[in-house]
Each structure stands twice: as C-alpha cells, then as structure tokens.
C-alpha cells in the first residue's frame, strides 16, 4: 500500500513522496495499522536513524520508492501471462476503458483501472491487484511529460494498446499537437518493438501518421 489509511495487517507500506504529502510522515501510522514491512528512500533513512532503529518491522531502503513501486508491479505482472490492453489518448480514456471492461466481463474475469488512476502511481497499483483469478487486464495510461507512456508500458508489458485520439488538452505539457502525438505514440512505439498489437482509430489523422 502507498496510503497509510488503507493499510491492512500484513501489507507492505511504500513511503511515496508526492506533491502534497510525503508518505514517510505516515510510517508510524502504517505500522500501527499492521504493515509488516516498510519501504523507504535512502535520503529519509539517513536523515532519520533513530526512527529506523525504533521501527519494529523490517525496513527496505531504496533510492526511489516510486521507481521501486513500478519495479514491483512489473515483476508481479510477469507472474501472470495474461493479455493486457493499455488504453491511452487525449480524451475518453476512462469511458473507453469502462466500455471495454463491461464487454469483456461477459466472458472474462477482468482487472481494470479504478476510476482514472492512470499515472506512475496508479498504474503500478492497478497491476499489483492482479491475481490468478484474472484472465485479462484493461489499464488506463495517462501522461503529462515525454517518456511517461514508455515507462508505464515497461511496467504493463501490454499485449494490446489503444489510443482514443490526439487532442489539444495536453498542449500545456507538450507545446504542440505534434508533441502530444509523439508522447501518446510512445505506446505504439513500445508495441511495435515488442510485437504487440495496436488498435488504431483511423478517423484521427494524427494517429494514422504515428501508427
């Protein structure tokens, strides 16, 4: 878990540094709630030696807890060799993901993103919910910087990928519509390099060019 409020007995707690909160400030709460292992970053561990000693659970020190979360999710995904569909795009990701989930649920046990948890924290959390009961996964992926979709694809190792469209909603991050297409197109690049299947919306001229 990355949220001390949701920790259950036996959980591993990863202390994530976010924009508003630092998970390291909630380690004691997580342990009191039943966490059996805490994962902290080296900077915090070196700055808080007394706390490290006082914690009565095993501690794992890593350079970056966000990257550790992603690596755990990647390794966990590899335990279950099931089809994974990644859903990206400027608009309609969540709606498209939910429609696909509903259709596939008629025949398969589907793991799907909850809400729109589609970033470098939400995607690993989704994959860590994967278990032997699931026969397919539908995972939403979002981006606000170059390289993010590639990073998420390396965690998901999708067998299939879908980009809904290329729009102007992310211009503040990528500058031009071509920049948006390049960022979203990282999914198709990954699929191409790893022999995956791209589902292309040919009605979108930008997608036609990058597919």
Spans of features found by a protein language model:
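N-terminal leader/targeting and accessory segments in enzymes
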Residues: 1-71
